[in-house]
Amino acid sequence: GQGLTDEGVHILDGFVGTGTFITRLLQLGLIEPKDLARKYAHELHANEILLLAYYIAAVNIETTYQDLRGELGDPGDYEPFPGLILTDTFQSWEDDDRPDLDVFVQNNERLEKLKALDIRVIVGNPPYSVGQDSANDDNANEPYPALDAAIRETYAARSNATLLRNLYDSYVR
């Protein structure tokens, strides 16, 4: 089998928030020191839709990486985290998703590369919105037709449960 540190094992936090899961992954030593630079530059991926959280995640992940490099005796120059993308993870894979080709060019390039990868590991804490369906709710469910169709045709079609609504909650999706 393969582990988190192995080459080619791409890790995604699709709802990175302020970067806690990625920073803890780096800090826990689950990635071997010899693999750290490769993993950081090419195999760690994090998506966030809220701009403030996106910037906080960038600072947290980049600072953690820099600190780890210093502990390993190779502080080197500061390196921005290339795996961070400003996006709605679910909407990004919808058929009607329209990338911003004018303003967020580099961000869109990162997203297209991510979508072509074989993601092996998903970490993180997705948004919680069960039972919410109004824009007035704290965290209303958004419709994702392609994702919902895939759930309907696979998990829901094979389920014996009578209440399938929770399958479409963002926490479960």
Language-model segments: which ranges?
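SAM-dependent methyltransferase catalytic region
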Residues: G1-R173
